[in-house]
Amino acid sequence: MTETTKTHVILLACGSFNPITKGHIQMFERARDYLHKTGRFIVIGGIVSPVHDSYGKQGLVSSRHRLIMCQLAVQNSDWIRVDPWECYQDTWQTTCSVLEHHRDLMKRVTGCILSNVNTPSMTPVIGQPQNETPQPIYQNSNVPTKPTAAKILGKVGESLSRICCVRPPVERFTFVDENANLGTVMRYEEIELRILLLCGSDLLESFCIPGLWNEADMEVIVGDFGIVVVPRDAADTDRIMNHSSILRKYKNNIMVVKDDINHPMSVVSSTKSRLALQHGDGHVVDYLSQPVIDYILKSQLYINASG
């Protein structure tokens, strides 16, 4: 497959990130490596989306702290960024709502075609008639006529500037879209782009708990978007999927990362990190990056047993 025919992917991880661990970052890296090795995908961005404060989980520190820790954890990454949208809403958002938000946002700011995990979308590029060739208006007539796929997620404002940082410098122009006044953006091309939910096997297993997830949401998450699962503690993902009719129905939409099942980061968790901090355990340096540890100590987080 050539670069232009591969499916382009953004990995989205939702969660408490209380705090964000080295395991979370490794989850992104392992998923990207695995998808690239299949020869069918190009991962062009990763998004960390911390949950809203009203989620109500015991010991959950404020989103202000969690967003800062997440930003510190990814500050050296050239493809993973932190998105505050979920935290900035008036109340807790479902995972399905977060996925739909980012899908709609990508449609607006990139103009590319987003599709379901199995069925390519026939939806026209936003702001363009279905039967007409898109005619962007250029401020600079010398823009390259064949942009690479990576350029679609170029700088469209500071809030999205880190979605895809692995891209060559290109000239910019003004794209006029009747549906979105976005100002200066990169030229786009029609490629297939999918947003996939990235999670551990513990979240996958939660789909099997009766009443925990709205079934309509599960249909959208697994059926329309798709999931990339990075197993933890050598979890049996086949057994997990067999316990849910929806997971069985859409098993082809669930990609399980099959690399080293004994990966050292697969046993790292936020819970272990909090306990290590509370007990002064030196192993915390194995769980959290140093900038995150420094921020936690400075802000006196997770010091008592209540979180």
Curated annotation (Swiss-Prot):
Keyword Nucleotidyltransferase: yes
Keyword hit for Glycoprotein: no
Single GO MF descriptor: nicotinamide-nucleotide adenylyltransferase activity
InterPro entries hit by this protein: Cyt_trans-like, Euk_NMN_adenylyltrnsfrase, NMNAT_euk, Rossmann-like_a/b/a_fold
Required co-factors: Mg(2+)
Main location per the UniProt record: Golgi
EC number: 2.7.7.1, 2.7.7.18
Superkingdom assignment: Eukaryota
Binding residues annotated for NAD(+), in chain numbering: 16-17, 92, 95, 200, 202, 212-213, 232
Positions of ATP binding: 24, 271-274
GO CC entries: axon; cytoplasmic vesicle membrane; cytosol; Golgi membrane; late endosome; synapse; trans-Golgi network
Note on cofactor: Divalent metal cations. Mg(2+) confers the highest activity.
Topology of the protein relative to the lipid bilayer: Lipid-anchor
Enzyme class, first EC level, given as a word: transferase
GO biological process: NAD biosynthetic process; negative regulation of cytoplasmic translation; neuron projection maintenance
Reactions catalysed: beta-nicotinamide D-ribonucleotide + ATP + H(+) = diphosphate + NAD(+); nicotinate beta-D-ribonucleotide + ATP + H(+) = deamido-NAD(+) + diphosphate
Disulfide bond positions: none
Pathway assigned to this chain's UniProt record: Cofactor biosynthesis; NAD(+) biosynthesis; NAD(+) from nicotinamide D-ribonucleotide: step 1/1; Cofactor biosynthesis; NAD(+) biosynthesis; deamido-NAD(+) from nicotinate D-ribonucleotide: step 1/1
UniProt function note: Nicotinamide/nicotinate-nucleotide adenylyltransferase that acts as an axon maintenance factor. Axon survival factor required for the maintenance of healthy axons: acts by delaying Wallerian axon degeneration, an evolutionarily conserved process that drives the loss of damaged axons. Catalyzes the formation of NAD(+) from nicotinamide mononucleotide (NMN) and ATP. Can also use the deamidated form; nicotinic acid mononucleotide (NaMN) as substrate but with a lower efficiency. Cannot use triazofurin monophosphate (TrMP) as substrate. Also catalyzes the reverse reaction, i.e.
Subunit organization: Monomer.
Family from the record: Belongs to the eukaryotic NMN adenylyltransferase family.
Protein name: Nicotinamide/nicotinic acid mononucleotide adenylyltransferase 2
Organism: Pongo abelii (Sumatran orangutan)
